[in-house]
Amino acid sequence: MIRFRYILSIICVAMLTTSCVVTRAIRYGNASVDDHRAFDQEVVSNGNDRFRFAELPMSERTLDTMKFVWPYYGKGEMQQHTIDEVTSSAVDNAALIIIHRDTILYERYFGEWNIDTQSQIFSVTKSITSMLCGVALNEGYIHSLDDSVTDYIPELKDADPTFSRLKIKHLLDMTAGLDFDENYALNPFSKMAKLYMGGNSMRIIENTKFSHEPGERYHYNSLTTAILGIVIERATGIPYAEYLSQKVWQPLGMEQSATIGIDDRRHRVAKSYAGLVTNVRDLAKVGRLYLNYGNWNGIQILDSTFVSTSLSPRLVGEKNLGLYSNSWYWGTYDEELSQRRFANKREMNEYYKEHPTVSTTNSWRDKNGGYIAAEYMRRRYFADRESLMDYYNNDVHTVLQTRDGYFAVQHNGGHYAFGVLGQILYINPEKEFWQ
């Protein structure tokens, strides 16, 4: 009995350690926009100057009343709704802002959120890190995107010789080839949990192997951008938070200082893949920088070529293609909203397991005891390329093929950064609300 108590005491002490992955997983659970409260933070200071968007008078904000087509999934119907109607019906909305020509056309906050509320933007941070890489490239700290990662982190040569063939451009495009699963399940023993909640990011990187050759295929994972953040720090000799402050937060006239999570106080490696904490208006200023191809009121912060590449539709990864360019997403699949009926739930689950390209928003029982699924991302497939081109009158950006047939990828000029909890920074240099 005494021995049991001794062992239990050791376990309890370990669980109480703040850097313990298991402790954090149990205490904080799944990802939350307030996760920054669980981690040590470094401040991304803003300067004394402020840039402020103009605000359209409330009487002129036509987007408040404009309706657009939106599916009402419970009945499988298409209906017209205002933006307010759509956003108020969703769960856990926080904030939404639409800016056009430096003027706020629409702005809403929900619940306890307001104009000053800051939250963790998760993987939108990846696009911010890409931007910071572009700044370092523009300033000559990074010589070329074809540079090997080991030029900046030489100790990785001893971890795995494949790191010598890993280039910065592979990190930007998610084609690093790392054997790392982006698993958000509440599992404190997963690689993702160890990276996100652990206290030594470099150890995770050094112990990770490669599943395939760098540049070969697109495979999204946060460890890739974690490495990119370290490359930027090594190249500049400046901590991530300080460099982001000097080159972006101060020049862009941010309203508030931001913060970035770090692995722990000893190693101080920034969570460059998910840890930035800011507000929507300041995040919109990053969008403005890209809309102006890296120029901020006459100052070229980012090289315009780097921005153009980031905002250029292209497929990355030879074997598994991704709609991802310099850590920005582009393009959309042509999708159909439809309903599919099944005899039972098991049949439904088996179908979607075999057809991973089809997603559903909702499912419900019908009066006969079967199931109906509302599909919202069912790609419009064609048996051959000719049929596809005829359907779209040859107006298609890219044609791809899977085992289900040929499908189109359209590009309307928009690009976006995306976070796991639905955070989106969308920019479109070609979009005009009024002609």
Annotate the PLM regions.
Residues 4-6, 20-113, 142, 341, ...:
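N-terminal leader/targeting segments and the immediately adjacent pre-domain N-terminus
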Residues 9-18:
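Bacterial N-terminal signal peptides
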Residues 76-78, 84-86, 114-121, 125, ...:
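Active-site-proximal loop and beta-strand segments within enzyme catalytic domains
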Residues 90-93, 117, 419-421:
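Short, small/polar residue-rich loop motifs at catalytic or cofactor-binding pockets
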Residues 99, 428-429:
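Short, acidic, Ser/Thr-enriched surface-loop or helix-capping motifs
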Residues 102, 120-145, 171, 228-232, ...:
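Active-site SXXK
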Residues 139-178, 207-209, 236-273, 278, ...:
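Active-site helix/loop module of the DD-peptidase/beta-lactamase fold
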Residues 242, 257-399, 404-427:
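Penicillin-binding protein/beta-lactamase superfamily catalytic region
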